[in-house]
């Protein structure tokens, strides 16, 4: 089969298409013929050798490696101990995350059955492949954590904030993968949502349900709003601290990419800073699939590239200002 692999770390140019054997499913797994692959930040973290992560949190892996965690496709075979899936089923999933051995940049992939859900009938493989990591991240931050695994970023267990009418939420990076799902999930629960993105994304985010919009290229969001119940910062990192001043006492800041925070400052302000690491979860993905199927949620596609052009997809990601998701398509013989 064809697969894109990393033989060394570096820029997009190190992504190389190879011929490799079709993998064999082990216990609890299915073999999936891949139709489309979602491109996610961990793909380029892996490509560049995890240089953005502290050494103690870097997962272990050996080269060559097939990157990728998100996919949508059709079940080819199932292991004898697998119930719930059969050959011919259309499925989608976030595979083996937070490990980095999903291996979805390929024509075939083995997948733990527990990581999969049936693909919503109302969307195609491209849109389904764009959903798993981003939608599960938004779900586990905002709706239900769904596991008891400790976070590498904090000692306390992450607890979502109750959302409902009257809850004031700001989503930073609202046009991106996680951000556009977070906006929609908050609106699904009746929250009042302010979306932060560059100005060209305003019509798109208004269409998704944003009540207010801040163009960060013209106005500083941390100076534009106050008394928020929750900030979901899909950009995260060191810049998240600026949002502390936007929260009311009892409010919460959820940075998707964790940064450094002063415990004394958050205690003085009476706010909570919390995050988690998304994990594969087929049951939660099935719930998200129902929302995708009935139109409550939609997947925005920024651009598509064929599998052999994975390098171009990573180059597109590096340019930023992504609206929704980048997806690789896999030709079917």
Language model segments and positions:
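Short glycine/proline-centered loop/turn elements that form peptide/ligand docking sites
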Residues: 80-81, 99, 193-204, 237-240
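Glycine-rich phosphate-binding loop and adjacent beta-alpha segment
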Residues: 234-300, 329-333
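A structural motif shared across PLP-dependent enzymes of the aminotransferase-like
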Residues: 98-113
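Glycine-rich beta-strand-centered segment in the early N-terminal region that forms part
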Residues: 21-38, 51-97
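Mid-domain Rossmann-like dinucleotide-binding core that forms the NAD(H)/NADP(H) cofactor-binding site
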Residues: 128-215
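A short acidic, Gly/Pro-enriched loop at the edge of an enzyme's catalytic core
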Residues: 223-230
């Amino acid at each position: 089969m064809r697969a894109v692999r990393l033989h060394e770390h570096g820029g997009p140019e190190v992504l190389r298409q190879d011929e490799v054997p079709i993998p064999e499913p082990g216990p609890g797994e299915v073999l999936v013929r891949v139709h489309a692959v979602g491109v996610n930040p961990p793909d380029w973290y892996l490509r560049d050798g995890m240089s953005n992560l502290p050494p103690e949190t870097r997962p272990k892996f050996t080269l060559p490696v097939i990157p990728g965690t998100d996919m949508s496709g059709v079940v080819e075979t199932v292991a004898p101990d697998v119930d719930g899936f059969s050959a011919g089923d259309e499925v989608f999933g976030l595979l083996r995350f937070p490990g980095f051995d999903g291996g979805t940049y390929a024509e075939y992939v083995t997948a733990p059955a527990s990581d999969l859900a049936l693909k919503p009938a109302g969307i195609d493989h491209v849109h389904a492949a764009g959903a798993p990591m981003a939608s599960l991240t938004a779900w586990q931050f905002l709706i239900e954590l769904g596991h008891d695994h400790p976070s590498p970023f904090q000692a306390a267990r992450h607890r979502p904030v109750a959302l409902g009418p009257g809850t004031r939420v700001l989503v930073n990076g609202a046009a991106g993968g996680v951000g556009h799902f977070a906006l929609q999930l908050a609106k699904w629960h009746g929250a009042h949502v302010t979306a932060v993105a560059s100005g060209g994304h305003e019509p798109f985010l208004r269409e998704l349900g944003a009540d207010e919009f801040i163009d960060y290229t013209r106005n500083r969001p941390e100076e534009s709003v106050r008394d928020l119940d929750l900030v979901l910062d899909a950009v995260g990192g060191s810049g998240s601290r600026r949002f502390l001043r936007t929260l009311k006492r009892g409010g919460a800041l959820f940075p998707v990419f964790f940064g450094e925070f002063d415990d004394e400052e958050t205690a003085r302000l009476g706010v909570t800073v919390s995050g988690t690491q998304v994990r594969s979860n087929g049951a939660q993905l099935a719930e998200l699939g129902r929302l995708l199927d009935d139109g409550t949620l939609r997947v925005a596609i920024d651009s598509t590239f064929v599998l052999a052009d994975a390098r171009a997809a990573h180059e597109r990601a590096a340019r930023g200002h992504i609206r929704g998701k980048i997806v690789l398509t896999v030709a079917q013989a």
